[in-house]
Amino acid sequence: MSQLELETCNLTLVRYPQVAENSALQAWDAADEYLLRELSTMEIAPGPRLIFNDTFGALACGLQAQSPVSISDSYLSQLATRHNLELNGYDADAVTLLDSMADLPDAPALVVMRIPKTIALLEHQLRMLRKVVTPQTRIIAGAKARDIHTSTLQLFERVMGPTKTSLAWKKARLVHCEWAELKVSEQSLTTEWELDGYGYRIQNHANVYSRNGLDIGARFFMQHLPEQIDGKIIDLGCGNGVIGLAALEANPDATVGFFDESYMAVASSQMNVEVNRPQDVERCSFVVNNGLSRVRRDTLQAVLCNPPFHQLQAVTDEIAWQMFMDARRCLQVGGELRIVGNRHLDYFHKLKRLFGNCETIASNTKFAVLRAVKTNSSR
């Protein structure tokens, strides 16, 4: 829990999932503060206020009196926004939450953006914005100064119009942009590549990890998946769904759920099943969710996971640990959690502590595939 002190208000903000009280990680940074400070000096005409990529709701809380629309690809960010609005005594419904695949309101008066780390997502959002903004729309973006590159500014200018940057303040910088009459060609930001050994054509929306090819951890994991399971399998943190696709093929009597907190990831997974295994769509579910939070206890036969070891730019195992605990809760006795992870992360001892058992299925110089089974003693 941390305090963001502004001239107009003081905000209490927490990360989501929440971290230990003594953690140095906080729910806002200097870019949030700089944006809110700058906005407090601007006169904005009536019209929709759009917020993009508000990580934990700092911008939504600071602008809640203006009934903004907050657009994010992250379900966790949306949960954090609602939680922090309520934590500060605001009406959570004062802020409209839209996912990254939704249509945007027309003619916004203001666009406030946290510049995303993924350049493809930034281009997707700028192209979506170009369809709805007007010459009168005020567009302001922010990020840590080290994350705003020449290529970032060139992208704003190429897609939107004249762009300038502010002076750095607390190691953050702002980008001011104006709409201009430009010839911007239509371009799909969905990538496509062939999954070797399977004959699948994999498509990826802009914010999906490893969007230009199969990452080496997933490739290793796919060689060591469980087979002939008759029950419910979850591909947890599914990304583009390649693990779930392989699980569908190896387990013809199972149902497979594709779960991720990214709207674009779940949409990519659904697209890839529909294109590559249309006969198996009825065996699948596609769910945007916080881990397995909406899954009933003792209902799953297997959980497959390539867990993240960072949230935004912070290295943390909080999300991975939550995934492991969710799996233990939702697995049936005898059901298994199977993961792949970098060897240096030492997931083996974490899983053994949580489940009471863990075995190494396979390993190489960089990755290990681990299996933990739920027993009566690990309920």
From Swiss-Prot:
Localization in the cell: Cytoplasm
Domain of life: Bacteria
Pfam families found in the cross-reference section: MTS
Catalytic activity line of the entry: guanosine(1835) in 23S rRNA + S-adenosyl-L-methionine = N(2)-methylguanosine(1835) in 23S rRNA + S-adenosyl-L-homocysteine + H(+)
EC number of this enzyme: 2.1.1.174
Keyword terms of this UniProt record: Cytoplasm, Methyltransferase, rRNA processing, S-adenosyl-L-methionine, Transferase
Enzyme category, top tier: transferase
Gene Ontology cellular component list: cytoplasm
InterPro entries in the record: rRNA_m2G-MeTrfase_RlmG, RsmC/RlmG, SAM-dependent_MTases_sf, Small_mtfrase_dom
One GO molecular-function entry: 23S rRNA (guanine(1835)-N(2))-methyltransferase activity
Family the entry assigns: Belongs to the methyltransferase superfamily. RlmG family.
Function of the protein: Specifically methylates the guanine in position 1835 (m2G1835) of 23S rRNA.
PANTHER family attached to this UniProt entry: RIBOSOMAL RNA LARGE SUBUNIT METHYLTRANSFERASE G (PTHR47816:SF5), RIBOSOMAL RNA SMALL SUBUNIT METHYLTRANSFERASE C (PTHR47816)
Official protein name in the record: Ribosomal RNA large subunit methyltransferase G
Organism: Pectobacterium atrosepticum (strain SCRI 1043 / ATCC BAA-672)
Protein encoded by which gene: rlmG
